[in-house]
Amino acid sequence: MDLWQLLLTLAVAGSSDAFSGSEATPAFLVRASQSLQILYPVLETNSSGNPKFTKCRSPELETFSCHWTDGANHSLQSPGSVQMFYIRRDIQEWKECPDYVSAGENSCYFNSSYTSVWTPYCIKLTSNGGIVDHKCFSVEDIVQPDPPVGLNWTLLNISLTEIHADILVKWEPPPNTDVKMGWIILEYELHYKELNETQWKMMDPLMVTSVPMYSLRLDKEYEVRVRTRQRNTEKYGKFSEVLLITFPQMNPSACEEDFQFPWFLIIMFGILGLAVTLFLLIFSKQQRIKMLILPPVPVPKIKGIDPDLLKEGKLEEVNTILAIHDNYKHEFYNDDSWVEFIELDIDDPDEKTEGSDTDRLLSNDHEKSLNIFGAKDDDSGRTSCYEPDILEADFHVSDMCDGTSEVAQPQRLKGEADISCLDQKNQNNSPSNDAAPANQQPSVIHVEENKPRPLLIGGTESTHQAVHHQLSNPSSLANIDFYAQVSDITPAGNVVLSPGQKNKTGNPQCDTHPEVVTSCQANFIVDNAYFCEVDAKKYIALAPHVEAESHVEPSFNQEDIYITTESLTTTAGRSGTAEHVPSSEIPVPDYTSIHIVQSPQGLVLNATALPLPDKEFLSSCGYVSTDQLNKIMP
């Protein structure tokens, strides 16, 4: 029966799949071991205290030995009670261990004659004819080289501080291994530690027999040991003897450890503190930081206007606010030459009635009646805003007429001619005008700077011709519009106008000579309601010198005052007006509509359309200042 089982085992082990090559693979060994366990199920059990294999080892890949333990059964401890058998591919039967003595007690040694590399082996332990343990392996898988020998070390160098040193550790491969011939390739692993430490430090495996060790302390002692293994395997052999490394005694002061500033700790604590500070800053100022990083989208609004007015649809109040502020004024109002502004003084309520235009309008005083037509010159010497159709070429002629005219500063002038006197004398051609030249003196009335100034109604020559025609016709006097009188401005921006009144005056009758009047009226050319230097010379040449001591010669002391032709013609007819008391009523102008409230002290009025004849473009000339007029006057 045993022979039959042995033959079956050999048949399985010698199959073509298992032994197809010259060497056995681990898979084959596993399959062989499984086959043996199937054939001999008694080998699987070893829990009764029977002997068992502990290890099988080959130190140089030429020989190997197997060891087992003693069993707990004392009957098996007698010599010859435990036997080991082995089988391999080239033999067809189990053979007993060739040497029970060389490897020691409870061991079996296989010398080179019984060792075959890359050949699987199966071994078993028997006691009294029964199998107690078994094992299958290949020789190359059980290689565990002997430890290296001849360890020593050499000092390489010492640091300048005499604190650290570098050494080189050397050893020799196991003497029983044929490393030089390349029969076996070994890898070495070095372990070291300080003398009083328990934990060994390990270096990376290397295939050389020497390794340097750096930065060893001169005041310390070190222990070094080395072990080896076959390349591409995981089982190391035993460690070599421990090598003690002791450096020669150095100067104690040189061996003192140099002080090292704890930069690492300071950097770590600094980073930690900075992170905490930044976190607290962000946590406390998160709203502000959010506003800086992500600013809110501004709500659409207009400066100075409550958004609720737009939501409630109060467009009238919005338009009023836009009209008051200059910033929101349309360009149309800036470019419109037919719009004039009235400046108001509402600082002192007592000054509103003192010397106002209403008093001058209602007064019968001759001097106040002439102030009605005073005007503020906002053009500062430019062409009047009431002549938008004058060609640009006229301005060049005006600049070349009088090079010494002062046109750089804004001027303020009040004066009005008695147009009705001259008009009536031209119609009647009365011979009683011989005494008129004595009274034809230019008159200039200065206006206080802090008082409200009425708007000057004047413009082109055609406009004055229309006014002359209306004044000569009593039935059309009631339709003349001059300006509107503003009495107060409410806090809401509303304007209160004074009621219309009329001054009673007689029909003007002048005693001036018709020849003088005719020549004066014919020679004056009105250009922008200012007095030209050429016209002034003509007027002075034509006006006869009258010795009237009661008349006061006009003096022009205020600088930058311009003379209008109407002011000069008014002086010519003033004496006749004083002698004759008119019986007709000169109408106070009707109220004109207010276009918009520009500012707390300014109004924008609608232009009054007067009947204009066909436009006639007249050449303009330079303006005459008061100083120049005084020089050319006789």
UniProtKB/Swiss-Prot annotation:
Region Required for JAK2 binding: start-end pairs: 290-375
Disulfide bonds: 56-66, 97-108, 122-136
Residues with the Phosphotyrosine modification: 483, 591
GO biological-process terms attached to the record: endocytosis
Motif WSXWS motif boundaries: 236-240
UniProt motif (Box 1 motif) ranges: 293-301
Signal peptide range in chain numbering: 1-18
Any Pfam family the entry gives: EpoR_lig-bind
Key words of the record: Cell membrane, Disulfide bond, Endocytosis, Glycoprotein, Membrane, Phosphoprotein, Receptor, Secreted, Signal, Transmembrane, Transmembrane helix, Ubl conjugation
Subcellular location: Cell membrane
Residues modified by glycosylation: 46, 73, 111, 152, 157, 196
Topological domains, Cytoplasmic: 285-634
Chain positions of motif UbE motif: 336-345
Keyword Transport belongs to the record: no
Chief location of this protein within or outside the cell: membrane
Domain Fibronectin type-III: 147-250
GO molecular function: cytokine receptor activity
Membrane topology, Extracellular segments: 19-260
Membrane topology according to the record: Single-pass type I membrane protein
Modified residues (Phosphoserine): 337
Its job: Receptor for pituitary gland growth hormone (GH1) involved in regulating postnatal body growth. On ligand binding, couples to the JAK2/STAT5 pathway.
Family statement drawn from the similarity comment of this UniProt entry: Belongs to the type I cytokine receptor family. Type 1 subfamily.
Record text about domains: The WSXWS motif appears to be necessary for proper protein folding and thereby efficient intracellular transport and cell-surface receptor binding.
Subunit structure: On growth hormone (GH) binding, forms homodimers and binds JAK2 via a box 1-containing domain.
Protein name: Growth hormone receptor
